[in-house]
Amino acid sequence: MFDIGVNLTSSQFESDRDAVISRARREGVTGMLLTGTGIEESRHALRLAEGAPGYCWSTAGIHPHEASTWTDAAALSIRQLAVHPQVVAIGECGLDFNRNFSTPSEQERAFSAQLAIAADLGMPVFMHCREAHSRFMMLLRPWLEKLPAAVLHCFTGTRDELDECLQAGLSIGITGWVCDERRGLALRALLEYIPDDRLLLETDAPYLLPRDLHPKPTSRRNEPCFLPHIVRQVAAWRKQDAVALGRVVDDNARRIFRLGQKGE
């Protein structure tokens, strides 16, 4: 089972990153994608990935919250980072109109520019969308034929939004949000509509700790070692074997991000 969304650059992991990776390995996590959310974070994610070759890979991009930092220099930095074999996707990029830490126009500019970079480099794109579906799809659609793959991570949308994403060819990342008995029930009901070959699973650690873990961890920090719990729960709700589903999502991640095919 492969975790496609780990924010290992977070300061919450500052004191024990090696132990976090070791715990994930011990629990059967077969690899992880480290998320770049800004230029410095993308550089940091790459350094961490290079420290665990064959197990960790990274993305390079600017998150919509940080879109106000977009410049021509940022675009050049992303292109330079993307040359490295461990960098396998452009992102995390997209739109987030929920909190608007950057203005919608700043977000749209940065998102469109990163889609152009991904298309130009022939790389998958790792995306974020919150309360911005219509505009997100409007900006994304013109690029889809030029992208080898497009992943929408941490999907929390509606059935209609899911259908539109699937029809457009997107792969869908599901987090421990689905384990939340308060907020996750609507998402849980959508699991059966995601085809096996479009499903990806992720922790989004250190965020989104599954609420139904037993026993409950003493810390609120999420970790990749909890991915097996998400796999088991999703498998049960999809009426699938958990071991088989773990293999499916691992195969999907390796195919979509072309792991081992970039000069490694």
Curated annotation (Swiss-Prot):
Cofactor: Mg(2+)
Chief place where the protein resides: cytoplasm
Gene Ontology cellular component annotations, sorted alphabetically: cytoplasm
Keyword vocabulary terms for this entry: Cytoplasm, Exonuclease, Hydrolase, Magnesium, Metal-binding, Nuclease
NCBIfam families according to UniProt: PRK10425.1
Record's subunit section: Monomer.
PANTHER family referenced in this protein's UniProt entry, alphabetically: DEOXYRIBONUCLEASE TATDN1, TATD FAMILY DEOXYRIBONUCLEASE
Protein's name according to its UniProt entry: 3'-5' ssDNA/RNA exonuclease TatD
Species for this entry: Musicola paradisiaca (strain Ech703)
